[in-house]
Amino acid sequence: MKIGTVTGSVWATRKASCLSGHTFLVVYTGTEELVASDQVGAGPGDRVLLVTGNTAARYCMDAPVDAVVVAIIDKQETREVY
């Protein structure tokens, strides 16, 4: 899983039938920008949780996607580890 911030949207009026109903977001993870299928209604500025790779395709019933937004992060805590 990866954490990222939604920076934009992608619109595609013509797409494969298996992607019908999907909306797409541009998500920046701090090291890369990804286009992800949005399953939770995230919007610009939202911090989100992503799944990528084979897990993403399985999550979307084998649609040809590499990344899926599966959660909007409300709060994140980090602790120092020694």
Feature-to-residue mapping (PLM):
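C-terminal structural segments of small proteins and small subunits
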Residues: V51-Y82
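N-terminal first-folded block
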Residues: M1-V27, T31
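Short alpha-helix capping/helix-loop boundary micro-motifs
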Residues: E32-S37
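Solvent-exposed, flexible loop/coil residues
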Residues: R14-K15, T23, D38, V69, ...
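Hydrophobic beta-strand signal
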Residues: T5, L49-L50
